[in-house]
Amino acid sequence: MNYKISLRYDGSLFYGWARQPQKRTVQGDLEEIFKSIFKINNIRIIGSGRTDKGVHAYEQTFSVKHSALKYDSHIIYQALCSRTSSDIQILEVQKVDDSFHAQYNATSKTYQYVINDYEFDLFRNNYELFVNQKINDQKILEALELFVGEHDFKSFSTSELTMTIRRINWVKIKRDTHLIIYINANGFLKNMVRMIVASCLDYAFNKISLAKIHELLIYPKKGASIKLAPACGLYLYKVYY
């Protein structure tokens, strides 16, 4: 049977989503749980995408398919909940058609980036970016809107892929004591959101011009000197199917 499973996780102590030798990852933890509970050695779960070290998820999705998995959804749900650590929360388990693939069937994803320009909070260090000056929200939005549409994001990624064209469907910001940035796209490249956020902050703090950001979109080049916003403020917010 094939299952679609949604979860959230605190990425602070993980070396990202994807399994890595000798390192703790979300995929690695989950696959070991499946092996332990269901006694299946060759299990492999497929995430909607990868998150990097220190990046969190409000809602990640993965699919898992194996001939030995023949259980009702609630049995899988209860079994996983009983074994996951305190930094992983299983949200939902659904039986799906055998053709479902968590990565390839995703139509878009939304990422969220949390910035604190209000008051330093030691206990939020792993969950937000603190900046020690007030941000001009309007300038952040001006810069963000340059990225909407289909572009070659080679300048705004550290990906080794040759195909670096993606479509950003929408952006928005929300403001209370913190500034929260939302970006929805049909797909994301490695470090793409963090480099977009860093560029927007540089514009807000008068370190880069809108014209320069626009130039890097029109004339993309690998290795453009774009900063990388810290992983701590980044969340995979929602995956759409």
UniProtKB/Swiss-Prot annotation:
GO terms for biological process: tRNA pseudouridine synthesis. Its EC number is 5.4.99.12. GO terms for molecular function: RNA binding; tRNA pseudouridine(38-40) synthase activity. The active site is at 52 (nucleophile). The keyword Nuclease does not apply. Substrate binds at residue 111. It is an enzyme of class 5 (isomerase). It catalyses: uridine(38/39/40) in tRNA = pseudouridine(38/39/40) in tRNA. It holds the Pfam family PseudoU_synth_1. Keywords: Isomerase, tRNA processing. Belongs to the tRNA pseudouridine synthase TruA family. Homodimer. HAMAP family: TruA (MF_00171). Formation of pseudouridine at positions 38, 39 and 40 in the anticodon stem and loop of transfer RNAs. This is tRNA pseudouridine synthase A. The lineage of its organism: Bacteria, Bacillati, Mycoplasmatota, Mycoplasmoidales, Mycoplasmoidaceae.
